[in-house]
Amino acid sequence: MDKRHDPSRRIIAPHGTQLSCKSWLTEAPMRMLMNNLHPDVAERPEDLVVYGGIGRAARDWDCYDKIIEVLQRLEDDETLLVQSGKPVGVFRTHADAPRVLIANSNLVPHWANWEHFNELDKLGLAMYGQMTAGSWIYIGTQGIVQGTYETFVSVAKQHFEGISKGKWILTGGLGGMGGAQTLAGTMAGFSVLACEVDETRIDFRLRTRYVDKKATSLDEALAMIEAANQAGKPVSVGLLANAADVFAELVKRGVTPDVVTDQTSAHDPLNGYLPQGWTMAEAAAMRKTDEAGVVKAAKASMAVQVQAMLNLQTAGAATLDYGNNIRQMAFEMGVENAFDFPGFVPAYIRPLFCEGIGPFRWVALSGDPEDIYKTDAKVKELIPDNPHLHNWLDMARERIAFQGLPARICWIGLKDRARLALAFNEMVKNGELSAPVVIGRDHLDSGSVASPNRETESMLDGSDAVSDWPLLNALLNTASGATWVSLHHGGGVGMGFSQHSGVVIVCDGTDAAAKRVGRVLWNDPATGVMRHADAGYEIAKNCAKEQGLDLPMQD
């Protein structure tokens, strides 16, 4: 019997103000863990899989049940320790300490590879936490929409003089992360053709309004794109097909998209990427009998796809890696120039990171969408001179369907995160919001990740692989009083290629929460400015000076 599979489970987080735990500081992680497994949020909730191949919220259902049980009895001076999705200890700490500390998927570097991890996973000794799956702050595909939108806007500025009308993006993958591409692309004015091998994922994105149309042949999909571009109205199309097949076929036909990228689960060749010519059922069966054969076939198909991306780049397409490590996989299969197209962070996002700008997200624990709409208005009130941000919030309200508990994300920087969080806490205190909110972020942020093929690719000083920074980030957030803190390995790009940390804090309207919020949401983005200033980025150095950061070696 597989302790991780239970199709009878249907997890819905409680709404409203009635507590199941002893305080909001423990109610919040309980609700957010449950929300990660909401059927409208998780990719395979019956298997505890939230997104990203096998990114889980808990190691197995026994561990899930025990975590819930412990959170419901946890005191406000106790801390629960979670080791790769398993609750392993409760210790007396103090009221300002985190209520939960999480470590997921961490391996000693020599053994930090998929082969060793998969053996541990089979033995029930490990769990892949991805980024926000195992740290209980996944909010559905919205969580990456704005970052993807910002990237596509930057692509338009750099390559098309800011004009995206009549242009289209080719990509692959409509899972929890990849599903953001279609909506983000049309928000930025592009049409989008996204290849996906799992029809249920296309249907899910149609239902949640992330995809406009479904196609079952390349000709049909291209016709939809062409009609939309001629009409001047962008459209997103989910094409039921293997990305490697489609990318190579477009090269053969001489059809060149304006932009090419990919968000298949290439980071996990065993569980995340379907080899060319295979059905999903065949792949599932082969994983049980010939793991090495599956990995080899998947990576061979990735090599085909990356070679096609290189060919499309040569033909004039703006081509970028969107952080799934597909270039590395192709390189290992003999595509020697796989890294000739850039990753999205050094190409488009790093200047934002230098100012501590990143994915600030919050969730209404009440379950009431009105709480999110009120906080949207507060963001506009406190940041009045940012029309780009206001436009994002307006589009998000109009076009993004909430998944599970209502949530919002917006990219803001060092000077604004603590200010907004303190305002939200005050709104809870004075009754403007019907219940507390939690504030967190993706692990993809300015100071919380070391990932040489993604967030820290091509650092100015060559420090791409130095992972002291996310460790320091996690330690500082713990010392600052975050409600829960996590430290993971392998998110986004797979085993051996990243280390990263997460943070979540509760705004419950108390004065004590205000003090914690003020510390955490200043210090957390400040570590990103520190990290980039240390690497030599002038934007970060200037930001540090303007904000009065005490960086001894920058004097």
UniProtKB/Swiss-Prot annotation:
Lineage: Bacteria, Pseudomonadati, Pseudomonadota, Gammaproteobacteria, Alteromonadales
Protein name (record): Urocanate hydratase
Gene giving rise to this polypeptide: hutU
Listed InterPro entries: Urocanase, Urocanase-like, Urocanase_C, Urocanase_central_sf, Urocanase_CS, Urocanase_N, Urocanase_Rossmann-like, Urocanase_sf
Chain sites annotated for binding NAD(+): 52-53, 130, 176-178, 196, 201, 242-243, 263-267, 273-274, 322, 492
Catalytic activity: 4-imidazolone-5-propanoate = trans-urocanate + H2O
Active site: C410
Organism: Shewanella sp. (strain W3-18-1)
Gene Ontology terms, MF aspect: urocanate hydratase activity
Protein's UniProt keywords contain Cytoplasm: yes
